[in-house]
């Protein structure tokens, strides 16, 4: 946290829609490598970022771990995350199975968070624009506030990004659609350009 603190004021003035700063591996890293309390880190971030909503990454029914947790644990965790400073929760399931996201969506919304449901992008014969649309439709029915195409491997090319985003915009109208990509394969810049 100490390395981040000096720039938090500057980050807060930029005007980000949200700042993803918690969840995923950051929670684990605090405990395993940094000897930090991840909850205390979150509270410190919130106290220094007054104008910028804080976002976290949540692995659906797995929360921040590597196994499924019961619904009552999911509810308690989502409540605690919002109480300690999280405003937006980006929820995903590595298998793109909405059933593994349903409880987290329900309890995050109940706690007052903006819920962004993310679909994990990959390339295979079964991962088509139509299959992603089917997952997105289920997530919208569950009450998500926005959608995200999560390309954590950097595999999404410009043409496919254009097709996916266009299809989602045509189907869901004004529902916000985010694209999250990594530069692993060198495609992200052009992919963002085409998606926009």
Across the structure, where does each feature detected by a protein language model lie?
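Active-site beta->alpha loop and helix N-cap motifs at the rims of alpha/beta catalytic domains
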Residues: 18, 23-140, 144-146, 154-158
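Generic hydrophobic/aromatic pocket-lining and core-packing "Φ" positions
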Residues: 8, 78, 105, 136, ...
